[in-house]
Structures are given as structure tokens and as C-alpha cells.
Swiss-Prot record:
SUPFAM superfamilies: Phosphofructokinase
Family matches, as NCBIfam families: PFKA_ATP (TIGR02482), PRK03202.1 (NF002872)
The keyword Ubl conjugation is assigned to this record: no
Pfam families linked: PFK
One term of GO molecular function: metal ion binding
Protein name listed in UniProt: ATP-dependent 6-phosphofructokinase 2
Binding-site residues, ATP: G14, R75, C76, G105, D106, G107, S108
Source taxonomy: Bacteria, Pseudomonadati, Bacteroidota, Bacteroidia, Bacteroidales
Family (UniProt): Belongs to the phosphofructokinase type A (PFKA) family. ATP-dependent PFK group I subfamily. Prokaryotic clade 'B1' sub-subfamily.
Gene this protein is translated from: pfkA2
Keywords: Allosteric enzyme, ATP-binding, Cytoplasm, Glycolysis, Kinase, Magnesium, Metal-binding, Nucleotide-binding, Transferase
Binding site for substrate: T129, I130, D131, R166, M173, G174, R175, E226, R250, H256, L257, Q258, R259
Length: 326
């Protein structure tokens, strides 16, 4: 196990349902293996400012069902500077922390990679993001819960869209990845998904919608990823309104609703497995890897691979949506 006797845990970047389940798993697995645990508040900001507290098993009782993160999360400009990272390292050493477990997305893992390279600190990452955009893992903590939140919202929007015979553009999160939009569309029976991985022109949408109305579909729902590459739901809605004023068009932006809520059973189990595996990795002297899951097996993915590679959307899912929305 080397010289690791105390680990620090932090959550960074956008919050995701299941982060608390991961905090619980890391804490209890560490204690089970004889390690001391320190909770670092507000992500890398807490490492810079010294907001650090010892965690016992009872500190993580009754949190597995909670959304958000008890450790809080924040952006930290100071950590992007060498001076800020030096402060973070000094605080880490003062607290006796030998290794870090970072729960977050690609920005969080990028920060961990830089920190590890500069100070030779063992860092283990857990994929915590609703976007599901990290390479090397089939799914990320929070993605399943966000997908179910989208499904619940679209089911309700479908009721009013049908009643008023309207075309709804529903914008979902995902940044530059279309996993939420595409799989949300398949799960909800939406007519189309606009995602950054594949271009969609207004005339393609219009022909698709026309076909639906010819087949007695009196309403349609299109899910749009929030990416700058797509322009978002408002962009498409305005273009359709201008070019095809015969359609009654509405826009719903789900926004931060997707980040909240109690995590699903899938996310709780995933977070628990990944959290326990993070401690296994530390005990094995692993460093600077993300813990992922592929084909239901735990994998160690180097930070460089997880961060630099784009996670592809499966073309067969695009085809499934196209075939089922006729």
C-alpha cells in the first residue's frame, strides 16, 4: 500500500445525483481498510482555503439517498494557478493527507492530473457528471438519475403537447455530448433529438414533422442538447417559427432540474461500487487513474485517456430513434 495512511475526498464541478453515495462508499471503504479520511469542502477551493474536516463513519450515515453533495462544490480560479496549487498542497500536507479521491467531470480530472504531476500526489478520480461524457466508462454517476428526470418531464410535456397540438422543443443538459438528449428521446418516445455529434438542419426537421402530421400525429416533441454546437432549443424553435409559421411551437428548458433529486438505485449502486474500488486502487498503489465501469467490470483508466479522448455516441441508437419515431 505504500505510505498512504490518510485520504482526502472532494467533489468538484457540477453536482450530480449519487455523489453522496460515492462519498459514503469511499469513506467507509477507507475506514474498513484502516485509513483515515478527511472531507474537503467546496472542491479544490476547500483545498486552497483549508476547509477540511475529519470524517468518521457516522459523518456519512443517511446520505446515500440524498441528491447534491454534502461536501458542496465550487469553481476555483486559484487552483488554476501554480500559486493556488501550492497553497492546496501545503494544506494537504498540513492535514496529513497522502492521497486524494476526486469526484467530478473532465474539468475536475484535468485539475487532478495537473496537481498530481506537479506534486507527485496519488489521485484517484470517480466519474461524477450527469453528462456521461467521460471516456473509459460506460456510464457516470448521476447520468441515470438525470435521464429519469428528463423522462418524467417529457412525459408531462407530452400531455399538454397533445392537448394543444403543439410542437415542443425540450432543451436538456449534456454540454458538448448528446447522451441525455438521444437516450431521453428514445426513452420518452420523442420524435427527434438534436445532438452536437450529428448536424440537423431545419428543413430535415420540417420534413420529418410533416410526415408525422400526414400520419395523424397531432403533436411532436424534439429533444435538443444544450451545446453551443446545436445552438440550443431556442435557436431551432425560432428558425422553425420563422420558416414554418403554420406550426404552434413551444420551448421548455429543463435546466438545473436535471441535476437534482434522489439518485436512482442504479446510480446508488454504481457510486458504491466505484467508491469502494477507489480505495482498492489506493491499496494497490494505483495513482492518477479514473475508476470506470465497462461491461459491468471495474476498470482503471489513466487520466490522460479519460480526459483527452471523446466518448462516442453510438450510431445504432441514432438509427433506433429514427426507426421508432415514424
Amino acid at each position: 500500500m505504500g505510505t498512504v495512511k490518510c485520504i482526502g475526498i472532494l467533489t468538484s464541478g457540477g453536482d450530480a445525483p449519487g455523489m453522496n453515495a460515492a462519498i459514503r462508499a469511499v469513506t467507509r471503504a477507507a475506514i474498513y481498510n484502516g485509513l483515515q479520511v478527511k472531507g474537503i469542502y467546496r472542491g479544490y477551493k476547500g483545498l486552497v482555503t483549508g476547509e477540511i474536516k475529519e470524517f468518521k463513519s457516522q459523518n456519512v450515515s443517511n446520505i446515500i439517498q440524498l441528491g447534491g453533495t454534502i461536501l458542496k462544490t465550487a469553481r476555483c480560479k486559484e487552483f488554476t494557478t501554480p500559486e493556488g496549487r501550492q497553497l492546496a498542497y501545503d494544506n494537504m500536507k498540513r492535514e496529513g493527507i497522502d492521497a486524494l479521491v476526486i469526484i467530478g467531470g473532465d474539468g475536475s480530472l484535468t485539475g487532478a492530473r495537473i496537481f498530481a504531476q506537479e506534486f507527485d500526489v496519488p489521485c484517484i478520480g470517480l466519474p461524477g457528471t450527469i453528462d456521461n461524457d467521460l471516456y473509459g466508462t460506460d456510464t457516470t454517476i448521476g447520468y441515470d438519475t438525470a435521464l429519469n428526470t428528463i423522462l418524467d418531464a417529457v412525459d408531462k410535456i407530452r400531455d399538454t403537447a397533445t392537448s394543444h397540438e403543439r410542437l415542443f422543443f425540450v432543451e436538456v443538459m449534456g454540454r458538448d455530448a448528446g447522451f441525455l438528449a438521444l437516450n431521453g428521446a428514445i426513452a420518452s418516445g420523442a420524435e427527434a433529438a438534436i445532438i452536437p455529434e450529428f448536424s440537423t438542419e431545419v428543413d430535415q426537421l420540417e420534413e420529418f414533422i410533416k410526415n408525422g402530421f400526414r400520419k395523424s400525429k397531432n403533436s411532436s416533441i424534439v429533444l435538443v442538447a444544450e451545446s453551443e454546437l446545436t445552438g440550443g432549443a431556442m435557436h431551432y424553435a425560432e428558425r422553425v417559427k420563422n420558416e414554418y409559421p403554420q406550426y404552434d411551437v413551444r420551448v421548455t428548458i429543463l435546466g438545473h432540474l436535471q441535476r437534482g433529486g434522489s439518485p436512482t438505485a442504479h446510480d446508488r449502486i454504481l457510486a458504491s461500487r466505484l467508491g469502494a474500488a477507489a480505495i482498492d486502487a489506493i491499496m494497490e498503489d494505483q495513482r492518477n487513474v479514473m475508476i470506470g465501469i465497462e461491461h459491468d467490470e471495474i476498470v482503471y483508466v489513466p487520466f490522460s485517456k479519460a480526459i483527452k479522448n471523446d466518448k462516442p455516441v453510438k450510431r445504432d441508437l441514432v438509427n433506433v430513434l429514427k426507426e421508432l419515431s415514424i
